[in-house]
């Protein structure tokens, strides 16, 4: 008789183990009300969906070793081609050699937007093997920016390709250029 009462009580109470792991029910509230009946003294509470874990589940590398961090840059500096700028706090190399880092050599062209667009089209037609990617024409935005110069950024596979580009291509006198490195990974 005690077993029958236990089975009857168990069949009318929500069959979720309190000590077990919570899972999210995919049934609607109408389906849940027909599938599980609750007594007036108990509250029917559905477990919330589990949030997925973001990022790696364990730290990559040795967390105590800061030397394993690639390209930890100083946010105040923009160009590592300047010999006086140390772009990496953990790097003793203050020169132009950026082989320690996954930095992409770039040439930044500055001038009138129409001149830059025409020049970029000529580069794609005649010198497409001398650079990797060319950006669209863009501007820096700031409330007090009085300069109306446009910019185009050219990226290269390595510094040798950039040197070959600068030796081969004649940059028009209305366009100025600056050398640098971009520490973003490109597609």
UniProtKB/Swiss-Prot annotation:
Entry GO CC: host cell nucleus
Record's signal peptide: none
Keyword annotations from UniProtKB, A to Z: Host nucleus
GO BP, sorted A to Z: regulation of DNA replication
Domain of life: Viruses
Compartments where found: Host nucleus
Listed InterPro entries: E2/EBNA1_C_sf, Nucleotide-bd_a/b_plait_sf, Papillomavirus_E2_C
Keyword Transcription: no
GO molecular function: DNA binding; DNA-binding transcription factor activity
Function: Plays a role in limiting the replication of viral DNA in keratinocytes. Recruits the host NCoR/SMRT complex to viral replication foci to mediate repression of both viral replication and transcription.
Family: Belongs to the papillomaviridae E8^E2C protein family.
Entry protein name: Protein E8^E2C
Organism in which the protein naturally occurs: Human papillomavirus 13
Lineage: Viruses, Monodnaviria, Shotokuvirae, Cossaviricota, Papovaviricetes
């Amino acid at each position: 008789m005690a077993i029958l009462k236990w089975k009857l009580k168990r069949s009318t109470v929500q069959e979720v183990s309190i000590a077990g792991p919570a899972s999210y029910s995919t049934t609607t509230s109408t389906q849940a009300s027909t599938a599980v009946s609750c007594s007036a003294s108990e509250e029917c509470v559905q477990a919330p969906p589990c949030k997925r874990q973001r990022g790696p589940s364990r730290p990559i590398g040795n967390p105590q070793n800061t030397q394993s961090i690639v390209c930890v840059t100083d946010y105040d500096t923009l160009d590592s081609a300047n010999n006086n700028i140390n772009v990496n706090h953990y790097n003793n190399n203050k020169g132009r050699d950026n082989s320690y880092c996954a930095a992409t050599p770039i040439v930044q062209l500055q001038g009138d937007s129409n001149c830059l667009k025409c020049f970029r089209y000529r580069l794609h037609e005649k010198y497409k093997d001398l650079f990797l990617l060319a950006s669209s024409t863009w501007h820096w935005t700031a409330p007090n920016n009085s300069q109306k110069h446009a910019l185009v950024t050219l990226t290269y596979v390595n510094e040798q390709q950039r040197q070959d580009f600068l030796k081969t291509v004649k940059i028009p006198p209305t366009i100025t250029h600056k050398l640098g490195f971009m520490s973003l990974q490109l597609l």
